[in-house]
Amino acid sequence: MRDHVEFCYYVIIYSLEKFQQRSKQFGISLFIFFLATAAVTVIVPTLLGVSQRGFFCDDDSIRYEYRKDTITAVQLMLYNLVLNAATVLFVEYYRMQKVESNINNPRYRWRNNHLHVLFVRLLTYFGYSQIGFVMNIALNIVTKHVVGRLRPHFLDVCKLANDTCVTGDSHRYITDYTCTGPPELVLEARKSFYSGHSAVSLYCATWSALYIQARLGPVLNNRIVVPISQTLMFMIGLGISFSRITDNKHHWSDVLVGIFIGIFLAVYTCTFWTDLFSNNSTESETQPLLLPRPPRTPRNSEDEERHRLDAVLPSTDSSIVFEATGPQDSDTILLPVPQSA
């Protein structure tokens, strides 16, 4: 978990520190964000531990057998990385080839090296997607430790002592009990609420679907490709979520809450971090950048008078139009130097 947090931090810093005029301020904000997230993810579980909840002896919802994961945690991480990265790569490549082929794309530099605009966009948008992913993981870990809900297979891995539920009152709530099963399985069996697989899979599906809608929907003539792609993403995400029920890892309510949290975090990330649906982020890639022509150097008395008037009332008709895409920042776009008349 800590390795993934560090990876996300360096990816975003690398992609943004030289590409925006506010790179230093933004980098500091990201550093504080990931530092706080990592601290919460590590410190809170260590201090609080997992909540030790009791159970009813006749509770059939925690008597299911233990099964292995259909989708492991490693596979879930790969799903997140591949889906988001492949989506950004395909969409941005299509835009560059079909939509922006006649537009001068901005040139980017990092440590005196030129970077391709596709590489920059891939790191930028993918980095934004990982911000919400890290928030998702951190929130899930803290919630699991605080709530401590028992998984459906809890009794199967706990292996209670023989005298725990032998009394006549089967509906008695047990708080003092001892598990004789493997400690690592017993510990994991106390982390049912809420489903991390559901939250992550629906976060990735929702973020990718919104990204396609914002970046590809307005420029793609075919009205079938985008809905089909979005439907497939949600089908995969829901399939991963529902597998947690069939694997006896989560109750249905755990999966449902995970789905809603994943969707909410995806919408939040797209709106407030990635800023996909802002007019500024979409129009800046199609609008020309206007640079006022510098006033001419006076050569005689008439030119001196005209120069004085131009300095007071500069004409907008003499502007130089430079087509550019992407954020209009002086650190990211190398503009041609206008020549004096």
UniProtKB/Swiss-Prot annotation:
It is a multi-pass membrane protein. It is an enzyme of class 3 (hydrolase). The chain crosses the membrane at residues 30-50, 71-91, 122-142, 223-243, 257-277. GO terms for molecular function: phosphatidate phosphatase activity. It comes from the Eukaryota. Signal peptide: none annotated. Residues 299-308 have a biased composition (Basic and acidic residues). Its EC number is 3.1.3.-. It is found in: Membrane. Keywords: Glycoprotein, Hydrolase, Membrane, Transmembrane, Transmembrane helix. The keyword Transmembrane helix applies. Belongs to the PA-phosphatase related phosphoesterase family. This is Phospholipid phosphatase homolog 1.2 homolog. It comes from Caenorhabditis elegans. The gene is plpp-1.2.
